[in-house]
Design a protein with these regions (language model features):
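Acidic/polar, glycine-rich intrinsically disordered N-terminal extensions of enzymes
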Residues: 1-169, 174-179, 204-209, 448, ...
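Gly/Pro-rich turn-and-neighbor structural signature
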Residues: 33-66, 71-80, 197, 237, ...
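Active-site cavity-forming subdomains of large catalytic enzyme subunits
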Residues: 132, 154-294, 319-333, 364-372
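Short glycine/threonine-rich loop-to-helix capping motif typified by GTGT followed
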Residues: 196, 271-279, 313-325, 354-368, ...
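Catalytic or ion-coupling anion/metal-binding cores of large enzyme and transporter domains
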Residues: 296-304, 332-337, 341-346, 412, ...
Length: 583
């Protein structure tokens, strides 16, 4: 009676369940017996009357799925609590920060990039006016590949799929009227990433900014170019030197800046599974860390500013598990393999983008829903920043309206769904924890396989990553063609005779002429004799692996050197890379 009275006074508290009633309180044998009895009675009888739609279920990466997950499954039991952990604590499964979105929402970082610097500046200000909380810049193919806008290889491509940048003047126009100490800027650039970083520094110094107050990211991940995106200039060894030099320079001079953004996104877009995306990205990370350590820099001095970039694909729970698992894997790699001491060095921070390759031309309005679910997976997986794709990106770069709707998608998730109120709300789910554990195990298996080949560079040179991605892409294409992998509007619920009516982003045919005119003006105004001397010094520095290439590059861009000037000078020293075909 006394116990009953005590419970009665505890108004609002649920009564404690007996261990016999609570599954978690059962012994393993009792739970196994309960599950077996359910399968043999209710389940078996029901399936005879209503068979399941598939004989077996798998994730998009091919991981087998149970019908139901219980406390019996690995990772769902109490002995996995150490690996699940708490947010902001090792191994960071539940998030890199103690308060996550309760303290600060993810950065809403919609991409912008087309035409000239002035054109993209206008789009960035439009996005800021509509609630964008970070900036992200895409560059055109000539800028990416190191060609000036008047080069023969640039014809027809200037400003078409990103902003055209030839000289420092273009970057000054790009960020005109934007305080770079008040907003973080991400620049999606790889083979010429060190030059764009030098230009960014030059813009900041020209405005009198303290470099340690700049926050932002340069993608600068050349390894995934060799395996996935296929945009490179130089062979792997000098290319790794460029990444190393930017990381070292950033660590010593820009305490809040991420000088590399190690990217799984492009690996996925090339056809890799989510498991491969996560594992291959970790292999690349290991290679970069080893490269910087070889330069004599202590890992805890640069690791806190390593950043990551992942995709949010269509398989919702697999994506959430991927994000959670890769945080844990990274923490263990940094602690156990590299011996880091700082928690910040073990903490994986990532930008996320919804999956462009899932966007379709047929029934393109459905892309809004695809993107929304992918964005929700990114948020539930704990992303630090997010770009949501425009519904029209299967046709062209997005219009202002498409970008506004994509941004509103994030804002609805942030402000209307209340999902940001609880940290890692799917944590503790038997299914999510089991899938997270399985992802972790398989990621480490792939890392071990690459280690056995001699590391990431050796695996690239052997074409191993490339073949793995190609095989996965082919498998997905077959499954989509057969209908095994449904795509609404493409192989399911197809509307015959549909003619998409969509207003695409227009390309201004005068962009190329305007950009070339601006380039020629810089060439006319600069001190070409001084420039020639600086380019000679660049070659000397490039030939001496002990020197950092960033200071001379900063001098060059301040002197009016174009990207093409710098790239062509280094071709004379390092040559160009030719990929061995993968059979």
């Amino acid at each position: 009676m006394a116990q009953e009275k005590s419970q009665g006074k505890s108004k609002g508290k649920p009564k404690e369940k007996s261990k016999k009633d609570a599954i978690a309180g059962m012994t393993r044998e009792q739970l196994e017996e309960k599950l077996r009895a359910w399968e043999e009675s209710e389940l078996a009888d029901f399936i005879t009357r209503q068979p399941e739609s598939q004989s077996e279920y798998k994730t998009a990466s091919g991981l087998p799925l149970n019908r139901i997950y219980t406390a019996l499954d690995k990772g769902a039991r109490g002995d996995g609590a150490a690996d699940i952990g708490l947010p902001g604590q090792y191994p960071f499964t539940r998030g890199p920060y103690p308060t996550m979105y309760r303290g600060r929402l993810w950065t809403m970082r919609q991409l912008a990039g087309y035409g000239t610097g002035a054109d993209t500046n206008e789009r960035m200000k439009y996005l800021l006016a509509h609630g964008n909380t970070g900036l992200s810049v895409d560059f055109d193919m000539p800028t990416l590949m190191g060609y000036d806008s008047d080069h023969a290889m640039s014809r027809g491509e200037v400003g078409r799929e990103g902003v055209a940048v030839d000289t420092l003047a273009d970057l000054e126009a790009l960020f005109d009227g934007i305080d770079l100490t008040e907003i973080s800027v991400s620049m999606t650039i790889n083979p010429t990433g060190w030059i764009l970083m030098a230009m960014y520094i030059a813009v900041a110094e020209g405005r009198g900014y303290d470099l340690n107050k700049l926050s932002g990211t340069i993608q600068n991940d050349i390894l995934k170019e060799y395996t996935a995106q296929k945009e490179w200039i130089y062979p792997p060894k000098p290319s790794m030197r460029l990444v190393r030099d930017t990381i070292v320079y950033g660590a010593r001079n820009m305490k809040r800046y991420n000088a590399v953004n190690i990217s799984g996104y492009h690996i996925s877009e090339a056809g890799a599974t989510s498991l491969q995306e996560a594992a291959f990205t970790m292999c690349n990370a290991i290679a970069y860390v080893e490269e910087v350590i070889k330069a004599g820099v202590a890992v805890d001095d640069f690791a806190p500013r390593l950043s990551y970039y992942f995709i949010a694909q269509a398989d919702f729970f697999e994506e959430v598990a991927k994000f959670r698992a890769v945080r844990r894997v990274y923490a263990k790699i940094m602690k156990e393999r590299f011996g880091v001491k700082k928690p910040e060095s073990m903490r994986l921070r990532f930008h996320c983008q919804t999956a462009a390759a899932t966007l379709t031309k047929p029934q393109h309005q459905v892309n809004l829903m695809r993107t929304a679910y992918q964005a929700l997976a990114a948020v539930l997986g704990g992303a630090q920043s997010l770009h949501t794709n425009g519904l029209d990106e299967a046709f062209a770069i997005p219009t202002e309206e498409a970008m506004r709707l994509a941004l509103r998608t994030q804002q609805v998730i942030a402000d209307e769904t209340n999902v940001a109120a609880v940290i890692d709300p799917l944590g503790g789910s038997y299914y999510v924890e089991a899938l997270t554990d399985e992802f972790e195990k398989r990621i480490f298996d792939i890392i071990e396989q690459v280690d056995d080949m001699g590391g990431t560079i050796k695996a690239i040179e052997q074409g191993w990553f490339q073949k793995e991605i190609a095989d996965s892409a082919y498998d997905y294409a077959l499954r989509k063609a057969s209908g095994e992998r449904p795509v609404i509007g493409v192989n399911k619920y197809v509307e015959e005779g549909e003619t998409p009516e969509v207003e695409t982003h227009p390309y201004d045919p005068e962009t190329e002429a305007r950009q070339i005119a601006a380039l020629n003006k810089v060439r006319d105004d600069r001190d070409n004799q001084k420039l020639s001397g600086l380019l000679d010094r660049l070659k000397t520095v490039a030939g001496d692996d002990s020197q950092n290439i960033m200071p001379i590059t900063i001098e060059l861009v301040k002197a009016g050197a174009s990207i093409g000037d710098i790239v062509e000078s280094l071709r004379e020293i390092w040559g160009t890379y030719r990929e061995t075909p993968v059979i």
